[in-house]
């Protein structure tokens, strides 16, 4: 169920308005810009998947609308589109009256087995269809992974590259510099281990694929953000090795001792380390090229400007809302909307928690109480120029 509400978190405690679903033509519904020739900021790196990573990108939007992968019960799928201007939820289709169940329809996906996810640039929608675990033993087109590009209205879909039978796209973000996609890939080996993560550059125009660099094999790596013309890479240097003979306390300690490293990674593979911290010291997220983090030792919320290499404390007061309950810490989400950081305020003594949003400009923290007309909680899925797209819990 999709709803719209005013796109300002300061006004987000209003009731949602139910969207109208209509069977209308895509051309009538969508006012979408097609690819432009040249771009003054082509070298600027941007994250074009969900901030939570490509495997969290089955729903993704821009200021005009939101794209969604719909899984059909019998294996196939479709691309759906929610248009904010008309408040309609439709197939991303070139056909008005259709069952949308074959390749003549631009919304149709032959298979979503293994996972089908989206990335979205100013000019194109990208489809990341992943391999299934059994692909190597059952090499069919339905099971094979690929990366495809199509226009914003779903037209002119082209496969840029097909994944190798044992290839896996690492669960991190997808970056784009206007001409190329950047993502991490690894190969599953016969003994169940994986090869080191490799930074892949995929040319949008013709699908030319280039391996930029191989990352340290002893660490786990994730693309988490972008800064100017570089990728922000987070690495876990000593990932916890879990086994059946470890107790619950041993597992907790091993995870807490994991060391996180932040690195700037250029499109030619050059790396510049920025900082390190233990997992139990920070909760972090990235927005507009900055790292925001809750420091668990000082009990403060900081912004680290990667440009000036200077952390600034934005909030260190008691965490309280209208109910006057005192919370001990903030756990930051990877998501941000309307320039606000989304977080969870947690009370350590009894585990009580509440969703909240922090405004870095006013340095204010507010409780999120957005509900539907029947008092169900809602989750923000995407942000438009005037509306949030939300789903009912």
What residue spans do the PLM features occupy?
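C-terminal motif of bacterial Sec signal peptides marking the signal peptidase cleavage site
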Residues: 2-4
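Surface-exposed loop/turn elements that mediate protein-protein interactions on large endomembrane-trafficking
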Residues: 6-11, 16-51, 74-105, 136-165, ...
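Repeated scaffold domains used in trafficking and secretory/extracellular systems
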Residues: 50-62, 102-120, 166-178, 217-228, ...
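Acidic/polar residues in short coil/turn loops that connect beta-strands
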Residues: 62, 86, 121-123, 153, ...
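Residue position within the beta-strands of beta-propeller blades
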Residues: 67-71, 126-129, 182-185, 232-235, ...
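Solvent-exposed, non-transmembrane segments of extracytoplasmic/periplasmic domains
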Residues: 70, 100-103, 108, 129
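Active-site-adjacent structural elements in enzyme catalytic domains
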Residues: 121, 130-134, 142-143
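Loop/turn-rich, solvent-exposed surfaces of beta-rich toroidal or solenoidal domains
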Residues: 329-354
């Amino acid at each position: 169920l999709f709803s719209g509400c005013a796109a300002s978190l300061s006004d987000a405690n209003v009731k949602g308005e139910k969207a109208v679903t209509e069977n209308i033509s895509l051309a009538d519904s969508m006012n979408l810009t097609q690819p432009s020739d040249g771009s003054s900021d082509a070298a600027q790196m941007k994250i074009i998947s969900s901030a939570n990573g490509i495997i969290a990108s089955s729903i993704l939007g821009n200021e005009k609308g939101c794209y969604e992968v719909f899984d059909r019960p019998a294996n196939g799928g479709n691309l759906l589109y929610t248009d904010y201007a008309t408040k309609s939820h439709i197939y991303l289709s070139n056909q008005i009256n259709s069952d949308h169940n074959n390749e003549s329809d631009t919304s149709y996906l032959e298979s979503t087995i293994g996972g089908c996810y989206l990335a979205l640039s100013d000019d194109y929608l990208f489809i990341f269809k992943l391999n299934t675990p059994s692909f190597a033993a059952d090499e069919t087109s339905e099971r094979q992974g690929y990366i495809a590009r199509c226009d914003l209205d779903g037209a002119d879909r082209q496969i840029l590259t097909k994944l190798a039978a044992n290839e896996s796209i690492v669960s991190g973000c997808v970056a784009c510099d206007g001409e190329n996609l950047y993502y991490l890939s690894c190969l599953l080996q016969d003994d169940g281990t994986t090869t080191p993560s490799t930074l892949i550059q995929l040319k949008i125009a013709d699908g030319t694929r280039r391996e930029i660099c191989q990352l340290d094999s002893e660490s786990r790596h994730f693309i988490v953000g972008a800064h100017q013309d570089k990728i922000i890479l987070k690495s876990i240097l000593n990932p916890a090795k879990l086994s059946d003979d470890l107790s619950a306390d041993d597992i907790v300690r091993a995870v807490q001792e994991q060391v996180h490293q932040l690195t700037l990674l250029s499109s030619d593979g050059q790396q510049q380390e920025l900082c390190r911290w233990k997992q139990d010291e920070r909760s972090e997220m990235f927005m507009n090229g900055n790292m925001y983090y809750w420091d668990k030792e000082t009990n403060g919320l900081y912004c680290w400007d990667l440009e000036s290499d200077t952390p600034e404390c934005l909030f260190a007061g008691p965490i309280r809302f209208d109910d006057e309950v005192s919370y001990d810490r903030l756990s930051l989400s990877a998501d941000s909307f309307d320039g606000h950081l989304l977080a969870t305020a947690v009370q350590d003594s009894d585990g009580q928690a509440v969703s909240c949003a922090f405004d870095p400009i006013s340095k204010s923290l507010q409780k999120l109480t957005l509900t539907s007309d029947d008092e169900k909680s809602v989750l923000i899925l995407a942000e438009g120029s005037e509306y949030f797209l939300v789903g009912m819990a």
